[in-house]
Amino acid sequence: MPIKVQNDLPAKKILEEENIFMMDEKRAMHQDIRPLKIAILNLMPLKEDTEVQLLRSLSNTPLQVDITFLTTDTYVGKNTATSHLEQFYLTHEDVKNRRFDGLIITGAPVEQMEFEEVAYWNELKKIMEWSKTHVTSTLHLCWGAQAGLYYHYGIKKYPLPDKMFGIFEHKLLNRKEPLVRGFDDVFLAPHSRHTETSREEILQNSDLTILAESEEAGVLIVMGGDGKHIFVMGHPEYDRITLDNEYKRDVNKGLEIQLPKNYYPSDDSMQRPNLSWRAHANALYTNWLNYYVYQVTPYEL
C-alpha cells in the first residue's frame, strides 16, 4: 500500500529502507483515486518508534492511505521533541470538523492510573465521542482498547498480580468474521501491560464479540457491533526489539521486571529475539482497512 505522509517525516526514510512504498505528497496529488484518510492518535511516549511500527503495519494492501498524526493538547510528553510534534502532529481541535475513514488510538503508559486520573482523559473522551459521527471505524490498541471499552461500554480494567509481558499463544474463536480472515487457529501476539479487562464483563454485552483470546494472556481481539469500534488488547504493531527495549530499560532503572515470556531464545536476553507475530499483525491491519474501512466508508466523506 502506498502510505502518504509528509515528505520530511523521519519514519519515511526508515520504512523506505525496508522497501515499503512511501508516497510523497506531490506524487499522491497526481493519482486519480481517493486515498483512505486515517488518523492516528499517538499516545505512546516514544512517538517516532510508534509511527514506524504503525505505518509498517498499514503498508500491506494496494490502497492508498493518507495519514494524519494526532496528539493531545492537554498533555505534552517529555520523550518526543516539541519541534517534531509541531511539524508532524495536529490536535483534535485542528480536525474536529473533518471526517476520517479510520482512526487508530494507541496504547499509553498510564494503565495503572484510573481513567479519570489521566491528564488528557477529558480530551480523549471528546475524541471518542467525535469518532462516533466522524470516523467510519476506530481501532483501539492496548490501553486505548481498555479506554474505549470503558468509555463506550462501561467495562472496567483490573490490576494484574504481575505484568503481562511477552509473546503469547492465542486461539481464534470466530473464523467467519472478516477481521480475522487468513488467521491460523492458533497464533502469537505481544502483550505488555499491568491490567486486564474481564472476559465475563465483555460477554455480558450483546454488542461485543470476542474474536481471539489466550489462556494465559486473556482476551486479545473484541469487536463492537458491525466493526465501528474494534479493540485489541495487545501490541500487534510491535517490532522485533520493542519488548527487548522495554525490558532492558526497566533493568537499567533498577526496576523489578521479569523476562518477557516466550521471547528470547532459551530465555537468554543476550540473544536476538525471534519475530513470530508479524504475519498475523499484518493480516489484522489489512483486514481492518479492507473490510471495515474501505468497503464501508462513503466515497465522499
Curated annotation (Swiss-Prot):
The record marks 192 as: Important for substrate specificity. GO terms for biological process: L-methionine biosynthetic process from homoserine via O-succinyl-L-homoserine and cystathionine. The active site is at residues 142, 235, 237. It is found in: Cytoplasm. InterPro entries: Class_I_gatase-like (IPR029062), HST_MetA (IPR005697), MetA_family (IPR033752). It catalyses: L-homoserine + acetyl-CoA = O-acetyl-L-homoserine + CoA. GO terms for molecular function: homoserine O-acetyltransferase activity; homoserine O-succinyltransferase activity. Pathway: Amino-acid biosynthesis; L-methionine biosynthesis via de novo pathway; O-acetyl-L-homoserine from L-homoserine: step 1/1. Keywords: Acyltransferase, Amino-acid biosynthesis, Cytoplasm, Methionine biosynthesis, Transferase. The keyword Cell cycle does not apply. Transfers an acetyl group from acetyl-CoA to L-homoserine, forming acetyl-L-homoserine. This is Homoserine O-acetyltransferase. It comes from Lachnoclostridium phytofermentans (strain ATCC 700394 / DSM 18823 / ISDg) (Clostridium phytofermentans).
